Amino acid sequence: MIRKNSYKIFWLAGESSADLHSELVMKALNDKFGNLTHIGIGGPRMQRQGLKPIFPFDKFAVMGFVEVVKHLIFFFKVQIRLSKLFSTEKFDLAILVDYPGLNLRIAKMADEMRIPVLYFICPQFWAWKHNRVYQLRDSVRYVACILPFEEELLKIHNINCSYIGHPIAEEITFELDRDSFARFFGLDSSKKWIGFFPGSRNNEITKMLPVFLQAAKKWNQNEYQILFSKSHNVNHQLYMHLIEGQKDIIIIDGYNYEMMKYCELLVCTSGTVTLEAAYIGTPLVICYKASYLSYLIGRKFVRIKRIGLPNIVLDSDLLPELIQGEMNPANIYKAGMQILTDPEMNTKIRKELFKLRAMLSNKHPSIEMPKIVRHLFETYG
């Protein structure tokens, strides 16, 4: 039974994917509980649902060990500010979304100040930094898992948790059919389309886009048309500078899901976009390249052999993964053409991706999260 008429929730979502995944959840919470106050860190989507931001969202978009080290002073200031905020504001709940490098520290801080913590999108302790599972156990009241296998792993450590479905099952919609998409962007419908997704962070774009552009040149322009996604989170001037002088490519700004659906093949930087593409059902090549130091440090601690989320969820080497030195134009073209020209391989990939879709869509976060929040309000409110 809900005991109060209004509740105050602290949020921390440090990345664009977390901002996206939190939007529908916030809307569902607002619809369910009505009088909620949302304060914290989040992007434009969360702000549309009523979040009052306390830091510029774009300051948090860093990736890799070296990049994080460069921003240590900023993150130290964030922790000081949040410590003061927690001591002055009466929060009924803290919802921390992914972003474990900072969020696990904030979870400990909130717990020490008697603010119950709900962790939405579990840290990938099963991949690396296994000690994070103990941080979850000590500081977090409940973990909402978005990958099917995480619930069982957490319960081994006596952590309150449940699998709530993956947010992409609710987020992915299509506004344009193939012909409308082609007309909107001036595409040649008679050709096969190959789509490149170089990333949603500036440092990703700097590393991945030049390699992807070189790979794109290898495809026969008479048979294939090359599409490049441009994330709204990426600095426009940086992106345009990197593609300056490139011919025979079409930049797709927005309509990512249509691009994924209507392309014959996708080449994607490792991340949420690979799971979105796999959920939609289009075969893809997964690529990843970090700074050399970040890669060396990461390789020492990573506990799994796969980096692509679709392969991890399926526990399979279904989709080709090109990492660091292997991520070069020749290998991208070779892996992509193998998928395009081998009907048996192509069919197998599509069948397995259909299974993945079923695994991720049997529950919905916008339905499950309000149940969890209600339970926490009733227990700790």
Task: Describe each PLM feature range.
Residues 1-381:
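Nucleotide-activated sugar donor-binding and catalytic core shared by glycosyltransferases
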